[in-house]
From Swiss-Prot:
Keywords: Membrane, Mitochondrion, Mitochondrion inner membrane, Transit peptide, Transmembrane, Transmembrane helix. Belongs to the COX16 family. Required for the assembly of the mitochondrial respiratory chain complex IV (CIV), also known as cytochrome c oxidase. May participate in merging the COX1 and COX2 assembly lines. The keyword Transport does not apply. One of its GO terms (cellular component) is mitochondrial inner membrane. InterPro entries: Cyt_c_Oxase_assmbl_COX16. It is a single-pass membrane protein. This is Cytochrome c oxidase assembly protein cox16, mitochondrial. It comes from Neurospora crassa (strain ATCC 24698 / 74-OR23-1A / CBS 708.71 / DSM 1257 / FGSC 987). The keyword Transit peptide applies.
Amino acid sequence: MTFQSKKFPSTANTNTFAAKYRAMMKKHPFLLFGLPFMSVIVAGSFILTPAAAIRYEKYDRKVRQVSREEELGLGQRKRRVDIREEYYRLAAKDLDNWEQKRVERLKGESDGLL
């Protein structure tokens, strides 16, 4: 004795939209699934292209090309750095004379004291 692999369709389920769609899907799978899927992909591409263009235009406005005159003027305000001078300046600081101060806590926050 063997059991059938096909389930017996009840009459309540055969009249629904989903049952009719499943039956039509077996006959025309590309028309009812493939074509709508591909059209959504193509339409999404056309819709998202301007969004990507806006993103790159915003980036281009932020990063602009610097002219030669502006480029030459940018480096004039910099301080010349000598490694020996920086070493002596940092060595002259009094790093041993300091006092620890507690940061004021927010209301309701634990202060960490035991």
